[in-house]
């Protein structure tokens, strides 16, 4: 018996919606990353983008455990001298609440071209509504 390898044109994509209200950031991110990669499918192939679309709503209501809201640090560097920028989740949540979930999921997908392609299927919204009702997404409970 030969090992099955999925072909990109054979992959059937579905849409899923995750409600992140009062859920722990990492738990939501793990579930989203697994669906984006396609690890929940029997045809999972590591080098093929066989994942589905994921919509995360209520990203502004996601919870961080412990004192991470103030103590965790997100660092960026512009490339210029003195261009290091440090943010806490509290600052990021005030400016752009979707970014917390996007960064968490981004760290859980491969850091390659394939991972960047998989991240394009992630849609994160701060509120409870999203513009993807026409795709009839399936709700996932955590």
From Swiss-Prot:
<dbReference type="GO" id="GO:0003735">
    <property type="term" value="F:structural constituent of ribosome"/>
</dbReference>
<dbReference type="GO" id="GO:0017148">
    <property type="term" value="P:negative regulation of translation"/>
</dbReference>
<comment type="subunit">
    <text>Part of the 50S ribosomal subunit.</text>
</comment>
<comment type="similarity">
    <text>Belongs to the universal ribosomal protein uL13 family.</text>
</comment>
<dbReference type="InterPro" id="IPR005822">
    <property type="entry name" value="Ribosomal_uL13"/>
</dbReference>
<dbReference type="Pfam" id="PF00572">
    <property type="entry name" value="Ribosomal_L13"/>
</dbReference>
<dbReference type="GO" id="GO:0003729">
    <property type="term" value="F:mRNA binding"/>
</dbReference>
<dbReference type="GO" id="GO:0022625">
    <property type="term" value="C:cytosolic large ribosomal subunit"/>
</dbReference>
<comment type="function">
    <text>This protein is one of the early assembly proteins of the 50S ribosomal subunit, although it is not seen to bind rRNA by itself. It is important during the early stages of 50S assembly.</text>
</comment>
<protein>
    <recommendedName>
        <fullName>Large ribosomal subunit protein uL13</fullName>
    </recommendedName>
</protein>
<dbReference type="InterPro" id="IPR023563">
    <property type="entry name" value="Ribosomal_uL13_CS"/>
</dbReference>
<dbReference type="InterPro" id="IPR005823">
    <property type="entry name" value="Ribosomal_uL13_bac-type"/>
</dbReference>
<dbReference type="GO" id="GO:0006412">
    <property type="term" value="P:translation"/>
</dbReference>
<keyword id="KW-0687">Ribonucleoprotein</keyword>
<keyword id="KW-0689">Ribosomal protein</keyword>
<dbReference type="InterPro" id="IPR036899">
    <property type="entry name" value="Ribosomal_uL13_sf"/>
</dbReference>
């Amino acid at each position: 018996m030969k090992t099955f390898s999925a072909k990109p044109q054979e992959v059937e994509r579905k849409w899923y919606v995750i409600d992140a209200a009062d859920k722990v950031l990492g738990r939501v991110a793990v579930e989203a990353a697994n669906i984006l990669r396609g690890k929940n499918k029997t045809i999972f192939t590591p080098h093929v983008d066989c994942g589905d679309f994921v919509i995360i709503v209520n990203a502004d209501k996601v919870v961080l455990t412990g004192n991470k809201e103030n103590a965790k640090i997100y660092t960026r560097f512009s490339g210029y001298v003195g261009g290091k920028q440090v943010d806490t989740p509290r600052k990021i949540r005030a400016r752009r609440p979707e970014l917390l979930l996007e960064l968490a999921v981004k760290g859980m997908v491969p850091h390659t071209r394939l991972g960047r392609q998989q991240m394009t299927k992630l849609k994160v919204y701060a509120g409870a509504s999203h513009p993807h009702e026409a795709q009839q997404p399936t709700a996932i409970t955590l």
